[in-house]
């Protein structure tokens, strides 16, 4: 019984430390990063809207009211209607669901690919790393929008196709970030010690490399998510994204805003505004996480440097440590 209690106690302490880390991170985000807090609010709002779109939207999906075509904002239609009489607010809400699904699944696929390429390339190095990086260089040399349009024209439109293409392309491009982090971690003594005692490559990568680059992966995932949402909107605007019957912010800009810009400019304003706010919020949240998780950048208040107040506290703390050392 004593052995079991002694075994359980350290595990509970580890769980408390992990929970305390995330609570402390959230508190520091609220206290030190106002733009990051705004970004977190935008991310939560996007997920909430996407999950509960059926309950939030005033009208069902693709509900048409031909009598009320191109109606201005009113009590019945808060943001007006489009050329078919479809409620614009409902389309925006259902479009948030599409952006959430494509953004989340595409980011997970992207991080799986980028982590696999980056970790193996950075860990093994040598000729393998050189061959992989030359392939990545060649891929990044071509404008990504052209690559996306070419692939989508071959495999056809569809949500699955968009997720697959965006996940693979962004994963290859962002593998450079993971590779750089792996090269930095690989030079540490504990990785070299693991190699010296005979740890296999798979064990070293999973036990010593991956846990120490999780901060980099999380930060990069937030940035990639914003990029994927923006690229999906670009593809849908050009006609290479999701089918027209699926509400998307990009297709709303293309099918409604472009054709009725003079007659009803709000049709382009609202999806463009929603897209801008979501991408901006996700990027601000990612920047705040980068500052909070990177020890070299800690201490800022919405910025990337130490402010005067925190700098004075740091100097005072250093003086106290120096005095204590002399005593």
Where are these regions (language model features)?
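Membrane-water interface segments at the C-terminal ends of transmembrane alpha-helices
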Residues: 38-60, 95, 134-157, 167, ...
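Hydrophobic alpha-helical transmembrane segments in multi-pass membrane proteins
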Residues: 98-114, 141-152, 211, 215-232, ...
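Generic hydrophobic transmembrane alpha-helix motif, especially the helices
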Residues: 78, 82, 88, 112-114, ...
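Alpha-helical transmembrane segments of multi-pass integral membrane proteins
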Residues: 102-106, 121, 136-137, 165, ...
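Glycine-rich helix-loop "coupling/hinge" segments at transmembrane-helix boundaries
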Residues: 151-154, 167, 181-182, 223, ...
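Hydrophobic/aromatic residues in alpha-helical transmembrane segments
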Residues: 44, 57, 113-117, 147, ...
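Gly/Trp-centered helix-boundary motif
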Residues: 1-111, 115, 126-127, 245, ...
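Amphipathic cytosolic juxtamembrane alpha-helices at the membrane-cytosol interface
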Residues: 86-101, 105, 125-133, 183-187, ...
């Amino acid at each position: 019984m004593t052995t079991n209690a002694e075994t359980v106690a350290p595990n509970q302490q580890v769980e408390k430390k992990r929970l305390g880390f995330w609570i402390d991170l959230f508190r520091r985000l609220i206290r030190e990063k106002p733009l990051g807090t705004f970004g977190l609010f935008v991310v939560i709002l996007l997920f909430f809207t996407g999950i509960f779109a059926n309950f939030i939207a005033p009208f069902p999906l693709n509900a048409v009211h031909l009598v009320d075509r191109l109606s201005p904002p009113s009590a019945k239609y808060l943001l007006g209607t489009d050329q078919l009489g479809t409620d614009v607010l409902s389309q925006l809400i259902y479009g948030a669901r599409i952006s959430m699904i494509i953004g989340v699944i595409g980011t997970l696929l992207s991080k799986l690919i980028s982590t696999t390429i980056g970790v193996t390339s950075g860990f093994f190095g040598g000729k393998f790393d050189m061959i992989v990086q030359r392939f990545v260089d060649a891929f990044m040399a071509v404008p990504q929008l052209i690559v996306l349009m070419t692939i989508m024209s071959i495999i056809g439109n569809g949500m699955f196709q968009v997720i697959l293409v965006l996940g693979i392309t962004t994963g290859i491009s962002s593998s450079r970030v993971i590779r750089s982090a792996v090269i930095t971690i690989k030079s540490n003594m504990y990785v070299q010690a693991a190699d010296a005692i005979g740890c296999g490559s798979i064990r070293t990568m999973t036990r010593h490399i991956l846990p120490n680059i999780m901060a980099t992966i999380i930060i990069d995932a937030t940035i990639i998510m914003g990029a994927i949402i923006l690229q999906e909107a670009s593809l849908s605007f050009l006609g290479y994204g999701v089918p027209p019957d699926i509400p998307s912010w990009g297709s709303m800009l293309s099918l409604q805003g472009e054709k009725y810009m003079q007659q009803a400019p709000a049709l382009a304003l609202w999806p463009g505004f929603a897209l801008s706010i979501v991408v901006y919020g996700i990027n601000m949240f990612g920047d705040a996480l980068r500052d909070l998780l990177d020890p070299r950048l800690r201490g800022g208040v919405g910025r990337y440097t130490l402010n005067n107040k925190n700098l004075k506290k740091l100097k005072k703390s250093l003086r106290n440590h120096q005095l204590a050392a002399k005593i």
